[in-house]
Swiss-Prot record:
Its main location: nucleus. Residues 97-120 have a biased composition (Basic residues). This is Protein LLP. Belongs to the learning-associated protein family. PANTHER family: PROTEIN LLP HOMOLOG.
Length: 120
């Protein structure tokens, strides 16, 4: 395909933009490099020797003995309606499936009501 004037102009403008931001980027990188040299890493990080770590009593061992409190309550869903006790549908069920299920449950309810009324 032939190159349009529009695409040529866009390419030209992208190049101008690239040059413009290259200057700003270079300045920013220079500033970051100068700040990195000024920063003294000795004040930021404190190293501990292996002996200090071994001699220090560990508090995490007492936490491991206690164990973790876990809530093991399972969500129970009714098979017919697929709702839990609160009337919510499962999290994995999308809205389209929820609407379909509601229609199905409504049909079951109307069939039950009709069946009860006909008894003589």
């Amino acid at each position: 395909m032939a190159k349009s004037i529009r695409s040529k102009h866009r390419r030209q403008m992208r190049n101008v933009k690239r040059e413009h931001f290259a200057k700003k980027d270079l300045d920013r990188l220079k500033r970051l490099a100068s700040k990195a040299q000024e920063l003294d890493l000795d004040n930021v990080v404190t190293m501990k020797s292996a002996e200090e770590i071994k001699n220090k009593p560990s508090t995490s061992a007492s936490d491991a003995d206690k164990g973790m409190e876990v809530d093991n309550t399972k969500k129970v869903f009714k098979k017919k309606t697929q709702q839990n006790e609160d009337g919510h549908y499962p999290q994995w069920m999308n809205q389209r499936a929820v609407k379909k299920q509601k229609v199905k449950v409504a049909k079951l309810k109307t069939k039950k009501k009709i069946g009860k009324k006909i008894k003589w």
